[in-house]
Amino acid sequence: MKLQCTQENLDKALSNISRAVANRTTLPITQNVLLKANNGKLQLSATNLEMAINTWIGCEISDEGETTIPARIFTDLIKSYPNDNIDLNLNNNNLIIKCGPYNSNLITQSSEEFPPIPESDSLDPTFIISPSPFSKLINSVIFSAAQDQSRPVLTGVKFSITNNKLTLATADGFRLSIISFELENENIPEIDFIVPAKSLLEVSRILPFTKDDISIFMTKASNQVIFKM
């Protein structure tokens, strides 16, 4: 893998996916970020096994490839660099990083051990919604999701769609919050699913920086939801 990108774009991308990097884990590779260079873009991915975030930045690729690298060290290093072009060159298990007068070498780990992250390419969106109303919906209910892990189902936000109406609901045993929104999509199938409140909170933190509509996908096994923005 050999490529060139800007420090600004790489720094922003790492900042976005850092929310999904595992802090304490029995699977050490989830403390890494996945780097995958192909088709003129660098994909950066992170997961804590409950939530995953993918993001892409433009770059000039000389050699396609992929690897993983410790997220915290890599993020801090890129943040310390000046606003200039960055060269990334993977040599065996060493990632050689150059930015202006600065050179660094970081040890990598094979991407084969990185947990698979579901893709939306082969899926049709369950529904589409604009960032502003979606943010309002989340913020209107997320505060009353339970914190007590003894009843895991109450620590999530319930999504339900009936007659093209999206309803979000939370409850913690003392409070109940419900809000509904009429979707513009037609013929949306009726569906119910629960998203962990912690994961949905991270989605809401990205929404203010999103201009395009949000596409929500359910995986074929219906046990994972994908927010594409």
State what each model feature region is.
Residues 1-229:
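Structural preference for solvent-exposed beta-strand-turn elements
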